[in-house]
Amino acid sequence: MKHVNYLSFFLLTLFSISFISCSDDDDNKLNTGITNQSWTEGKSLEISQDNELSVSFNAAAKWVASVTSGADWCKLNTTSGTKGQSTLKLSVSTSSTTDRTARISINIDGYSPASFEVTQKGTSVPQTTEDMEINAKVDEYLREMYLWNDEYKTLNLDHNKGYEDFFYDALGSMTTNTLDKKTYVGSDGKTYYNLFSYIQLLPNISSTRTTKIVNKELAYSFGITGITPISIGTQAENTIYFCLQGVYPDSPASEAGLKRGAMISLINGKKINNNNINNFYYDILLPDATINYTLTEDVVEGGTITGQKEYTITSKATYNNPVIFSNVKEDIEGHRIGYLVYSGFEASFDQELFNVFKDFKNKNVTDLILDLRYNGGGHTMSANLIATCIAGTASQGKVFSSLRYNDERMAKLNNKREDELFAYSSYPNLGTSLSAGSLNLPRVYCLVGNGTASASELVINSLEGIDLDVILIGEKTTGKNVGMEYEEYTVRNNTYRVVPITFQSYNAKGFGEYEKGFEPDILMDETNPYNEQGVFYIHKY
């Protein structure tokens, strides 16, 4: 009997212990292990775009958190923690036009899960601006065509920016596009950069088709081909001049009497200084409307300023023929020397350019001086025309240039560069053979400077690729071994042209690494052609 009572007591005790243990487990299952939380049960917390939300609580053990609904837009910046006072951080990077809710779950070891809700309030539908529309088109084009599109695709872009800021900020922020983004050290010791790629809003003026492929384009201009800023004097006291590189025939500048070499000291009565030089420079070379300027020239005779002369000029929409000047000097020690000043590779003027080479051929020129000092480039097809006419039959069937695109485009070409041949037999833009302008020269003399770039350098490189002797006279060239394929978009009656770098060019020998420029065979500074010592020139800008 005692044995039975003892056993009954033991079983009763064991049952009681088990019941107590089970009761504790049930309590934990109902208990979240969270105290002192900063949210209120049943009330949603508000979260907004780009503002991190922090919630706090005390955890009974280590914990993990997750987004159980709304994970496509709500992000946890903190996903786990340890026992004690804890903070959970959340963020949202996008907006929504309607209210949306996410649920956050916190699981503490050995306890039931807890959850709370966050709500992002909907905003009104954003007004789509013209900038946003053109930025979307530009973004799509750059993703496909930009030579360094791999890095470009990783950028976090703001389509709300103005179209120029959107374009230049994006490409300027990149690091792999060193052939586009040229760095330099300013006078203040800081590093700056220039981009070859650009975007522009085209003027609303009509064009006339003049060749088979390219239109002549009307553009506002004073008719000044280029400007060389020069500082004269001492470092403490000097005058900044705009030295005119040349003027286009029948232009406002030529009609006013301005000539190459004019030293402009005042613009609208103001001296040129470091604060206004950039604005004056671009306003004179690239006016975007009809505007008036009064230019004051310091008249220099025998190295002395003898007076001043004023010119009032008005920009107008015009076609600027890049064939500035050409002639032939005959019978110089048995040579007939052709001379061509060419300011830009404008394919719409290819007929005028080809006419010059036909004239050279008819006059049996034996030597050619090609003046590219102020030629910053243009259409590569026009570079092919010039190079082919110079080399003549020696160029037939040979590679003019070989193009490398971005990796995606190269994959479609089986990673083989795309070759373009010299256009001797057929030049598509004129629909004719170039034999009538073929000079068959063994060498060419090129006048070059630091503004000689792109298609100008392409002519040099392509001719050297077929072993034609190219003699460079002047200063080191720019070093632009890359080219562009532009696209135009019309948005709300405005037309934009986006011109990014899309390829690198190589010659027939596979050489294309001239990003530091071509060094001249004969060095000559045109502001001091005789290399005199102690002259008053300080520097060119």
Describe the residue ranges of each PLM region.
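Short, exposed coil/turn segments at beta-strand boundaries within extracellular/luminal domains
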Residues: 108-115, 303-308
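C-terminal "post-core" interaction segments
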Residues: 337-340, 349-355, 360-367, 376-541
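Bacterial Sec-dependent N-terminal signal peptides
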Residues: 3, 12-40, 111-132
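Solvent-exposed, low-complexity, repeat-rich "mucin-like" stalks and linkers
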Residues: 35-67
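A short beta-strand micro-motif common to beta-rich folds, especially ectodomain repeats
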Residues: 88, 98-110
